[in-house]
């Protein structure tokens, strides 16, 4: 009886992946009126995400499916919740923008592609077979390439999308080359088989090289320096909300895939070259992200460079010895980053806008927010200080607990360099705060702002509440995360 119940749950789960996709395609070609079609697509996509969340709650937290091709743990389940909630939030923001007539750059095809990419991401996080991982990553990547363009005819968008496609293709080729190298030497693509054979042939450099190539390909997809050039141009051409979607979802999935590889293969095979190589990339990324952000005037490029810096901090668990604890802190840091960035983008595109209906694009335009609404101005300052990681906010503490284990392990010089570089990004965040508070004189040619109403206010209030609560219950939140992902 229990076996039949589990099979029924599996059938429902995988049909929920595919049936809504078919329904959305049929809706997009059968309904003639544009507004009705878009609203139905939004509702069906949000309902599908809710159903998947319900199924995640019903099914077992740990399972092995499809002959070991998919394995789910408490950590993966927890991160899947985060991914689905973030996706629901972004889709709701797109829906609100369409209702209010804002320029959100969303089409019916884009909604279908967003859902298709979500399917690929959910599978890739559970993948325990290299070819399953590769195919699911490619589903996501193909959707992202098209979303980066999203029917935008601007030169910068086309150029960014083309760069994304080329670099993504190179990264996929590197990953596939690593998979081929591993299969040639082990005769298997399953993580467990690779681990057993790899430990028997501990001196076989080809298996280690194959895993290193897979990690390198994933790092390129993440946008870590010096493989970051495509990311800046791509994000600038996609629009603020789509940038938010691409930035957050890509980080969530890539980090979890790297954690899976680390916990299942890299740790046991003792591949030191990966740890040392990633340490160099982390330092280079922090330097590039910090220096690059200091000379940016556009909001979206500033967010892109900030994303590069945060990518480096999120993969610090690779260079530490206490991996389990560092993974917990990385997840906690990721949650703080998502909430802070969500509130920032909600303020910029959802609460205030120019007279002609456009979004704030230049950082210097932020000075007028203080003149028009001091409550929103204060909220924006709080979020910027929170993202900068200044004390006493929890984002400062989450950075500290990520970096401090390196001191315990004796990596003092590396820790000092990381601290110095993170201070650099704090300086630029504080420069933006200065623009809001001090440079508040209205200038000719700068539009005033009109307040809008809707879900954006709710999102901002919710984010500010999290910032306050996380200050008070920091230890409790980290303990809850440890319990959820079954790490003590």
Swiss-Prot record:
Q: Supply the alphabetized keyword list.
A: Electron transport, Membrane, Mitochondrion, Mitochondrion inner membrane, NAD, Respiratory chain, Translocase, Transmembrane, Transmembrane helix, Transport, Ubiquinone
User: How does this protein sit in the membrane?
Assistant: Multi-pass membrane protein
> What reaction gets catalysed by this protein?
a ubiquinone + NADH + 5 H(+)(in) = a ubiquinol + NAD(+) + 4 H(+)(out)
Which EC number(s) does UniProt give? 7.1.1.2
Q: Which GO terms describe its cellular component?
A: mitochondrial inner membrane
From the UniProt record, which GO molecular function terms apply? Answer: NADH dehydrogenase (ubiquinone) activity
According to its UniProt record, this protein's enzyme class is translocase
Subcellular locations according to the entry: Mitochondrion inner membrane
Q: Where are the transmembrane segments?
A: 11-31, 38-58, 74-94, 106-126, 129-149, 162-182, 211-231, 239-259, 271-291, 299-319, 331-351, 376-396, 412-434, 460-480
Q: What does this protein do?
A: Core subunit of the mitochondrial membrane respiratory chain NADH dehydrogenase (Complex I) that is believed to belong to the minimal assembly required for catalysis. Complex I functions in the transfer of electrons from NADH to the respiratory chain. The immediate electron acceptor for the enzyme is believed to be ubiquinone.
Similarity annotation: Belongs to the complex I subunit 2 family.
The name this protein carries in UniProt is NADH-ubiquinone oxidoreductase chain 2
